[in-house]
Amino acid sequence: MNVLSCSINTLIKEGLYEISGVEVGQHFYWQIGGFQVHAQVLITSWVVIAILLGSSVLAIRNPQTIPTDGQNFFEFVLEFIRDVSKTQIGEEYGPWVPFIGTLFLFIFVSNWSGALLPWKIIQLPQGELAAPTNDINTTVALALLTSVAYFYAGLSKKGLGYFSKYIQPTPILLPINILEDFTKPLSLSFRLFGNILADELVVVVLVSLVPLVVPIPVMFLGLFTSGIQALIFATLAAAYIGESMEGHH
């Protein structure tokens, strides 16, 4: 026991277990003025935005009376987003279709980029590239945008009377109703971040253990769940906006 205690004390004194110095993951930053900008997220987000803009321009630059395959695909996506928005928001869904559609497409392409794009081959001074939604900064930003959107929807529809919802059906529920508005963005951000991070980690581990056959069905499952996560986020965002405009829980 004395020998073991001495060994542990020696290790601690030599600093081999300085927990405060341990970092989970590394990040690549740009210094802009007095601010540190998370470059990894910006780079991958710009790539996703470029993919969305480029594919949209290519598909609809010459609209045809008889739609082409690309035009048909984007019309189908638009109809799908309109249906989701109308179902969750109601008859006043029109102005919110661009917002819900942008959320869905950005998250969908971001999620798929983690599985389909070879981010790892791009070398950075620190850290590595991954899907934008694999970073908590991205998912929190998307969730906060959703929060701003449903507050704006409620205030624009009802004015200051929107805040009366916090004391309905009884003022006793005021703390719970306030807490609910904080838990919505938290649940949105952590659900998306956790699922995408876990999916990528599972694929990485399986590829390192069995690099040929086993990871392939897992990757297909990851693509499916990534699409579902994008749909869940967009659907919940639309539901929160519809709820704030209707004033019911």
UniProtKB/Swiss-Prot annotation:
Membrane topology recorded in Swiss-Prot or TrEMBL: Multi-pass membrane protein
Q: What is its main location?
A: plastid
Sorted keywords for this record are:
ATP synthesis, CF(0), Chloroplast, Hydrogen ion transport, Ion transport, Membrane, Plastid, Thylakoid, Transmembrane, Transmembrane helix, Transport
Give an example GO cellular component term for this record.
Answer: chloroplast thylakoid membrane
Where in or outside the cell is it found? Plastid, Chloroplast thylakoid membrane
Membrane-spanning regions, if any? 40-60, 97-117, 136-156, 201-221, 222-242
What Gene Ontology terms describe what this protein does at the molecular function level?
A: proton-transporting ATP synthase activity, rotational mechanism
The answer, when asked if Nucleus is one of the entry's keywords, is no
* Top-level taxon of the source organism: Eukaryota
Q: Does the keyword Ribosomal protein apply?
A: no
Family, according to the entry, reads as follows: Belongs to the ATPase A chain family.
Q: How does it assemble?
A: F-type ATPases have 2 components, CF(1) - the catalytic core - and CF(0) - the membrane proton channel. CF(1) has five subunits: alpha(3), beta(3), gamma(1), delta(1), epsilon(1). CF(0) has four main subunits: a, b, b' and c.
Q: What does this protein do, in the record's words? A: Key component of the proton channel; it plays a direct role in the translocation of protons across the membrane.
The record's section on NCBIfam families has: ATP_synt_6_or_A
What PANTHER family does the record point to?
ATP SYNTHASE SUBUNIT A, CHLOROPLASTIC
Can you name this protein? ATP synthase subunit a, chloroplastic
Record the organism.
Olimarabidopsis pumila (Dwarf rocket)
Upper taxonomic classification of the species?
A: Eukaryota, Viridiplantae, Streptophyta, Embryophyta, Tracheophyta
